[in-house]
């Protein structure tokens, strides 16, 4: 799995560029951090969408308390039955973006709150991490959501409680 480029900022950098993701997207499938082990599932789903990750979860059949005294004690939320609905939703979102899975990322622009990704086939992805609606290119992107415009101009949107 590739690191989330948002985490790689240092005191010497004021902007993050998802270099690895831009180079690899369209060539191989890759994952990011496990969605179920991130402090905010909605943000991690938006990261997955923005950076082109394949959904990734670390799961167990029983609760994570059974891992407390093992080498896997960092796994704090892993019971499959609790994540089943979220997993189905993440794969549904991934399927929505399947038309760009084999495409390169031509450009990636981000101010840390809003991101625009353009793919080799001309499709565009708008990601809004803000708690307010975002208007860009005469399009509205819901708070905490994304808008995908495929190469034919067809829009697909997911947001808020539907994530």
Residue ranges and their predicted role:
Residues 1-163:
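Active-site-proximal substrate-binding groove within the catalytic cores of carbohydrate-active enzymes
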